[in-house]
Amino acid sequence: MRHYEIVLLIHPDQSEQVPAMLERYKGLVTAAGGKVHRVEDWGRRQLAYLINKLAKAHYLCLNIECSKETLLELETGFKFNDAVLRHLTVVKSKAETAPSIMMKAVEREESRKAPQPQEAAA
């Protein structure tokens, strides 16, 4: 089995259904004997250019280990799911389990937006 990193751009109106989509895709991988090493929800972000007249999309990143047949089944599901605007699959040499650079940036943005304890007391 090979290691893959999959990045999905989900329609922003379908953000509520992202957890169910993740569970379905993770279940598909594990049912076929694969492993899910990392799942990251990067949230709703600005697109560099319009896709289907949309300026934002919900980003997801999955690092999985599965067979080629399972990957083809996943990609077919992405193509026929109207909520998936784009997907990108990259072959990796090993399993990635550490947080990605994007996830660190998301965490940094969230910590900056959260009110500081000193400000809340004032």
Curated annotation (Swiss-Prot):
The keyword rRNA-binding applies. It comes from the Bacteria. Keywords: Ribonucleoprotein, Ribosomal protein, RNA-binding, rRNA-binding. One of its GO terms (biological process) is translation. InterPro entries: Ribosomal_bS6, Ribosomal_bS6_CS, Ribosomal_bS6_sf, Ribosomal_S6_plastid/chlpt, Transl_elong_EF1B/ribsomal_bS6. GO terms for cellular component: cytosolic small ribosomal subunit. GO terms for molecular function: small ribosomal subunit rRNA binding; structural constituent of ribosome. Gene3D superfamilies: 3.30.70.60. The keyword DNA damage does not apply. Pfam families: Ribosomal_S6. SUPFAM superfamilies: Ribosomal protein S6. Binds together with bS18 to 16S ribosomal RNA. Belongs to the bacterial ribosomal protein bS6 family. This is Small ribosomal subunit protein bS6. The lineage of its organism: Bacteria, Pseudomonadati, Pseudomonadota, Betaproteobacteria, Burkholderiales. The gene is rpsF.
